[in-house]
Amino acid sequence: MTSPVPIAVVGPTATGKSDLALDLAERLGGEIVNIDAMQLYRGMDIGTAKLAPAERRGIPHHQLDVLDVTETATVANYQQAAVRDVEGIAARGAVPVIVGGSMMYVQSLLDEWSFPATDASVRARWEAVLAEKGVAAVHAELGRVDPEAAASILPTDGRRLVRALEVVEITGKPFAASAPRIGEPRWGTHIVGVDRDTAELDDRIRLRTRLMFERGLVDEVRGLIDVGLREGVTAPRAIGYAQVLAWLDGEYDLDEAQERTFIGTRRYVRRQRSWFRRDTRIHWVDGSDPDLADTTIRTLGETRRMGER
């Protein structure tokens, strides 16, 4: 018996991916696998627009609420866990519906991507350089040992620069040698991208941001501080949470925190759009389509008829 082929619903934030994934899973007999890095965290609900259990229509969801805010989310750990989930769903005869917009997490799941081992002592040494000398010094060192990697990573992205230096030192090879191999998606996954008109999407982001603050984002952050949010590495950097933490620290007023959350989200959406639009395997649909699920299913049917898996 042939296993069901997964469907991935990807694209920018606030386009309507979650609702489409629910519709597809409901119609096709599927289970959902989250691919939003910040929705991995327990208690980070309002600021990540995580669906409440009552909104999930009784459909099983995987890779939600699997980390404490003190734990570090990593692409490598996610890949291992999500691959098990997708293959387990397919083995049960259900359709895995993968949904989210965290770019590297999407790539790790759908493409062949082997992650080099880590070395805590090597990483700690480079993290110390980052802390003591700043991101410019780390970027300059990467430029010396691996110019191609230095050119491909934002000079302000300290975490990725440190990781690149760690990989180069451990493997003795350029960082690009561990890059994903783009080709046929893993499991022959059908990839659907959801997007909207830019002005419309900006309005949706503005509304979503306002509602997050009205519905208790500040109280959510305060509660998470009590369980270690400030001690985390990745969780406190999430858009919305970082801005509320800065407000609590007196860096600016609450209106400014909300505005910065909107601007940060809009900027992130532009990055997502640029990233996903480069992937020619994605079949794009308009999130404003009133018959979006029907259109998507039709698109998937046409894909199969064209001979794609």
Swiss-Prot record:
Binding site for ATP: 11-18
Residues flagged as site, Interaction with substrate tRNA: 102, 123
Catalytic activity: adenosine(37) in tRNA + dimethylallyl diphosphate = N(6)-dimethylallyladenosine(37) in tRNA + diphosphate
Enzyme class per UniProt: transferase
InterPro entries: Dimethylallyltransferase, IPT, P-loop_NTPase
Subunit structure and binding partners: Monomer.
Family annotation (NCBIfam families): miaA
Function per UniProt: Catalyzes the transfer of a dimethylallyl group onto the adenine at position 37 in tRNAs that read codons beginning with uridine, leading to the formation of N6-(dimethylallyl)adenosine (i(6)A).
Protein name: tRNA dimethylallyltransferase
Organism: Rhodococcus jostii (strain RHA1)
